[in-house]
Every structure is written in structure tokens, then in C-alpha cells.
Amino acid sequence: MAKSKFERTKPHVNIGTIGHVDHGKTSLTAAITKYFGEFKAYDQIDAAPEERARGITISTAHVEYETEKRHYAHVDCPGHADYVKNMITGAAQMDGAILVVSAADGPMPQTREHILLARQVGVPAIVVFLNKVDQVDDAELLELVELEIRELLSKYDFPGDDIPIVKGSALAALEDKDKSIGEDAVRLLMSEVDNYIPTPERPVDQPFLLPIEDVFSISGRGTVVTGRVERGVIKVGEEIEIIGIRPTSKTTVTGVEMFRKLLDQGQAGDNIGALLRGVDREGIERGQVLAKPGSVTPHTRFKAEAYILTKDEGGRHTPFFTNYRPQFYFRTTDVTGIVTLPEGIEMVMPGDNVAMDVSLIVPIAMEEKLRFAIREGGRTVGAGIVSKIIE
């Protein structure tokens, strides 16, 4: 099935397979590429290369394929720990996920944990592939497993009653056996993914935000901040807010330059210098953000989901307890924060993932799903994501 080069005119969506070990995530990934992309065999996907994201090494396999409607980038991880790290660090962003559950086993501990993680890190939508249906002869048993999956999804605030569940066999698809549960099921799955997982809003259509990396003054012109526009568009003459660390203030962008050329606007992905009206060099600093007024607010207290590195990954050698005070690295700067562990959790060991409350000593421009690194003296010891803002 030779395919021509990918058309970039289609909307692009990032997805991934999640679910319990040996339920068939990698086989399904291979089967999807067989019908919608350049076929990648199970072994090619399973031998995932290691990558580093936020100082953490993660094994992830990336494949790409396309349906009539969309172009997809798909990630599959070989080990459970890789999933946890991947979802928390956002190394591979997911606009949606395909949850793979073996019909023979039903939901297992990692099924539950991946659904919880998907909820915590804000994966917007899930479609289910009920795999290995050829191993279950009893239709009632299949119904029970489906019911169990729906209940589990609902428990973690996904719309369990509405989520599409496609029954099939990834192996049958790979081996060209029983077409109804093989090829047909994989095609049906992708049509459900096309229709059920929303197309993400492009960064350029979102409200403007630029994390400040550097500040300097140009004599006779004023104060310039530099950084990469994270989202949205900024036009010369627009009013913006300076948010985080200090009280929020307003200013007007009087100039935008890129590669020493003056522009009338900067947009998501551009590295720009922005000239600000009436801002003193001392009144602004790295770690603050420029943003569209009212679009983002400063906060100090939040709930987070975090992964703590093992000693081998260069992390801590010892556990930590409530009142642990590391630095939290948000976007471009470190801020000290105080950790409170949930009731019933005495300590956190290197290699754990944990839900925790954090209180920062100064406010940071913050939204749910914002990611951060946890550092001690400049060394990364963990990674996390804001799951809920408290104040």
C-alpha cells in the first residue's frame, strides 16, 4: 500500500495509544499504519528510541498516517513508566487517545491509571478499542467488559456512556484474517477517531501569550523584551498585560522585530523582540509573560500531577515528605514552592508519580495543563502538570 507524500492541507491531530501492558497497543498501532500510512511492523514500533524531555529520558515510538479527513501523528510507548513520563512531561502532546483494552482481561490496573492520567493531564477525548475479541466466545461477557470500561471512564469524568467502543482484533488485522474484526474494525476505529476526537485549535488562533526570556533597554527607544510567542498573534499598537511575579500591569507594544527586521506583527512560533511603551527596565523580568488582557491570571496555589525521577535518571536518591521546598520551573524561570502531599501518603520515592498540592512564594501566570519541571539547584528532579488551580 504505497502512499504518496503526506498532504499538509489536512488538519493535523496528535494522538496516542494508552492502556494496560500486553493488551495490544503496539499491535494496534502497527495495524493502523498498515491501512492508513506507511506500514511499520510491530518490532519497528516496539524498539522505540529514547528521547529526552525536560531532562527525563523516555522511550517513545512515533508513527504518522492519514485518513481522508486528517493527518495524524501517533505515539506509542513500550513501557508503563514511559507512558507516565510521557503524559506528565507532554513530550508527545495528545489531542486525543485510543484506549486499548483486551476483551479477555477487561480493565486492568494500568488501564485505570492511564485513564486517570489522561484526566489529570487534560487529554480532551478518548476512543476505545476493545481488542482480542476473538478470544471471547461469550457475547454477554463482552457486554460486561464494555460496561466495565464505560463505568471506569465515567468515574474519571470522561463521558463513559457516549465514548465510541470499537470491537476487533489488531492481530487479525495484521495477519489479514477475519476481516470483520480485523481490517474492518481498524477502519471503523479510525472513522470514530476522525469524528469523535475534536480538531485542536491552532496555536495562532488562541489568545496571545509570550513568556519573557530576556529584557534590555535601548536608549531613546525604551524597553525591549525577547521570547518566543507561545500562542496567538501580537500586532503593533495592541495593549497587553505583563503577568506574574509582580502585580499585573498593562502596556502597549510599540514595535515588533524579528531577525533585526521590523514587523507589524508576531505570531505563534516566532522568536521576537517586543518594544514596550512606558515600561522601566527594572519593572519587568524573565519569568513574567506578556498576554492578551484578561486571558490568563497569576496564581500561587495549585494541584499538580508529578513524576519524580529515579536516581538512575539523575534524580533524588532519597524520598521527600510534606513541606518539601524545591524550585518549580515554569516556562522560563524557577520559583520556590512548598509541597503538601495528599492524605495517606507519607512520602514520595524517586520513580513515583504523585498528586500533590503546591504553594508558590510568588505568583506565576498559570492555567490548567501548564507543565513545569521540579528542580533542586538547577538539577531536574521531576516533572509535572497543573491539574487544578486553587488560588
From Swiss-Prot:
Where primarily located?
cytoplasm
The entry lists its GO molecular-function terms as: GTP binding; GTPase activity; guanosine tetraphosphate binding; translation elongation factor activity
> Which InterPro entries does the record match to this protein?
EF-Tu_GTP-bd (IPR041709), EF-Tu_GTPase (IPR050055), EFTu-like_2 (IPR004161), EFTU_2 (IPR033720), G_TR_CS (IPR031157), P-loop_NTPase (IPR027417), Small_GTP-bd (IPR005225), T_Tr_GTP-bd_dom (IPR000795)
How is this protein annotated for GO cellular component? Answer: cytosol
Keywords on this record?
A: Cytoplasm, Elongation factor, GTP-binding, Hydrolase, Magnesium, Metal-binding, Nucleotide-binding, Protein biosynthesis
* Substrates-to-products reaction catalysed: GTP + H2O = GDP + phosphate + H(+)
Family of the protein in this entry? Belongs to the TRAFAC class translation factor GTPase superfamily. Classic translation factor GTPase family. EF-Tu/EF-1A subfamily.
Its assembly, as annotated, is:
Monomer.
User: What role does this protein play?
Assistant: GTP hydrolase that promotes the GTP-dependent binding of aminoacyl-tRNA to the A-site of ribosomes during protein biosynthesis.
Q: Which NCBIfam families match?
A: EF-Tu, PRK00049.1, PRK12735.1, PRK12736.1, small_GTP
| This protein's name | Elongation factor Tu 1
What organism does the UniProt record list as the source?
Bartonella quintana (strain Toulouse)
| Chain's gene name | tuf1
